[in-house]
């Protein structure tokens, strides 16, 4: 078997940049890492509770965290920020208070900014949420994968590969099904590839969804 590496980590420094930007002493590193995880979990939980969508898509593509001595800057890249802001003008303020409570940060300022992604379905995280929603509502996996590919075609992508693993359609034996459209050159480091692994809980058990999207070469 070929040894598979995470396409994002493989391309760090060429086409991919870090989602967390901060420095710390080695003894405080673990603490900083846990803090990042807390911020991300807190934001995801808040968005999950406060956005109601028919397709089950929360629309968070990624959360970037930049830390300085007295400031934590959080940038949330969302596909559909309207869902969070539209019906609640205080949405971002509430989120900020929630995160501050979770972190217990007294002497540091917290800034949260939300930016919109131009083509939401060109992002694997949002696409995985869409497929997960379809699988939960018992749509056949092939139909869900084809619909996802149709959505990415509107987002001007060069290629996509989707893989679903587990007890598909409630079958006794777990298996892996995958579909590819266009080119997905995983070995080319200069190829800009976005990747996501997502788990979805269905009534039959847990399914794993992996998505690779090829955006073009740099």
UniProtKB/Swiss-Prot annotation:
Can you supply one Gene Ontology CC term for this chain's record?
cytosolic small ribosomal subunit
Instruction: Keywords in alphabetical order, please.
Output: Chloroplast, Plastid, Ribonucleoprotein, Ribosomal protein, RNA-binding, rRNA-binding
Where is it localised? Plastid, Chloroplast
**Location of the KH type-2 domain:** 47-118
Q: Which Gene3D superfamilies match?
A: 3.30.300.20, Ribosomal protein S3, C-terminal domain
| PROSITE patterns per UniProt | KH_TYPE_2, RIBOSOMAL_S3
InterPro entries, per database record = KH_dom-like_a/b (IPR015946), KH_dom_type_2 (IPR004044), KH_sf_prok-type (IPR009019), Ribosomal_S3_C_sf (IPR036419), Ribosomal_uS3_bac-typ (IPR005704), Ribosomal_uS3_C (IPR001351), Ribosomal_uS3_CS (IPR018280)
Transmembrane portions of the chain: none
- List GO molecular-function terms, semicolon-separated: rRNA binding; structural constituent of ribosome
CDD domains linked: KH-II_30S_S3 (cd02412)
Annotated GO biological process: translation
Q: Give the matching Pfam families.
A: Ribosomal_S3_C
Signal peptide (UniProt feature, chain positions): none
Tell me which family the UniProt entry assigns to this protein.
Belongs to the universal ribosomal protein uS3 family.
Describe the task this protein carries out: Component of the chloroplast ribosome (chloro-ribosome), a dedicated translation machinery responsible for the synthesis of chloroplast genome-encoded proteins, including proteins of the transcription and translation machinery and components of the photosynthetic apparatus.
Please identify the protein, giving its name as recorded: Small ribosomal subunit protein uS3c
Q: Which organism is it from?
A: Spinacia oleracea
Source taxonomy: Eukaryota, Viridiplantae, Streptophyta, Embryophyta, Tracheophyta
